[in-house]
Amino acid sequence: MKIYKDYSLLPYNTFGMDVKAARFVEYDSVEELTGFLAGHEDVFPCLHVGGGSNLLFTADYAGTVLHSAIKGREIVGETEDWVDIRVGAGEVWDDFVAYAVACGWYGAENLSLIPGEVGASAVQNIGAYGVEAKDLIRFVDTVCLETGCRRRFANEECCYSYRESVFKKELKGKYIVTHVTFRLGKRPAFRLDYGNIQAELGGAEPTLEGVRQAVIRIRRAKLPDPKLLGNGGSFFMNPVVPAEQFEALAQRFPDMPCYPVAGGRVKIPAGWLIDRCGWKGKSIGRAAVYERQALVLVNLGGASGKEILQLAQAVAHSVKDKFGVTIAPEVNII
């Protein structure tokens, strides 16, 4: 276990905010985590970070920041059709996807190149190109911050919805994810009807590696490398509206794209809404809307978290004024 005071969080947020944590704790086992919680009464306020790809710090953090270095992958169940694999929360997400593809297991390939760590996938319900983490997750193993007790959540207990989970709502800040068990398929099953994966494949017969590489090419063409240009990926969630509201909008904006979702509702791409408001490539101070993808806000260099937030609020206000639609941040603002 590593414990530091006044520790820079620059390596733990992809926006490139050089803020500090009053205390930073990194653990590499459940036992180390529970031991720390049992031995320290001053844990709170507390924040758990992974790769920091979904965080925007607007100031130094006055409490304890925890980071998991729990690694490992273990097959815990298997049949001719599927495999259950339990993965440490500190594993890099895309490393896990690459491993699954190399093993010939289906399900995670559309989630290639999403930044962050495995633990965050279960909290954020990450998703891309028609696939969400909830489609693969069977169990989420956790530790309660208040009691140090372990608890396993089955998929249905996680209350997953679009970019949401019980860990972001009712139980926010109460449990730390230590391991996630995924069920992946052994028989060919691709999801190619979302985005332009089919076009990127160019008519070739889909393979696991082929789909993975197609997704990687698409993402790299759209999204900036945070090592070169600080960003948190998609800053806003795609809004979901009632069908009646979408139909009214479609009368005014016939070219508005949409995706039907459960419950007779419609998902609208937030990037399209932002682009139509004229924000692509625009900036406030050193914070800007990425010129290739309006859904992404970037740090041009030296931007503060407050500048990024100011830009985000201005963008959301414009979308609300023009379309009457509220776009909410996908990024966790601290």
What positions do the PLM features span?
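Anion-binding (especially nucleotide phosphate/pyrophosphate-binding) glycine-rich loop
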Residues: 1-147
